[in-house]
Amino acid sequence: GFSSIFRGVAKFASKGLGKDLARLGVNLVACKISKQC
């Protein structure tokens, strides 16, 4: 079903996108600090 597909995608994403998420987090913090959101 959909949930198993989603779980598979989430597993794949957690491996591949960990760095991207970290970068997004850093960008978000920088954005908040500089108040340019």
Curated annotation (Swiss-Prot):
Chief localization: secreted
GO biological-process terms attached to the record: defense response to Gram-negative bacterium
Tissue spec: Expressed by the skin glands.
InterPro entries for the chain: Antimicrobial_frog_2 (IPR012521)
One GO term describing the cellular component: extracellular region
Compartments it resides in: Secreted
Cysteine pairings via disulfide bonds: C31-C37
Superkingdom of the organism of origin: Eukaryota
Claim: Secreted is one of the keywords in the record: yes
Keywords: Amphibian defense peptide, Antibiotic, Antimicrobial, Disulfide bond, Secreted
Function (record text): Antibacterial activity against Gram-negative bacterium E.coli.
Stated family: Belongs to the frog skin active peptide (FSAP) family. Esculentin subfamily.
Name by which UniProt lists this protein: Esculentin-2P
Organism: Lithobates pipiens (Northern leopard frog)
Taxonomic lineage from the root: Eukaryota, Metazoa, Chordata, Craniata, Vertebrata
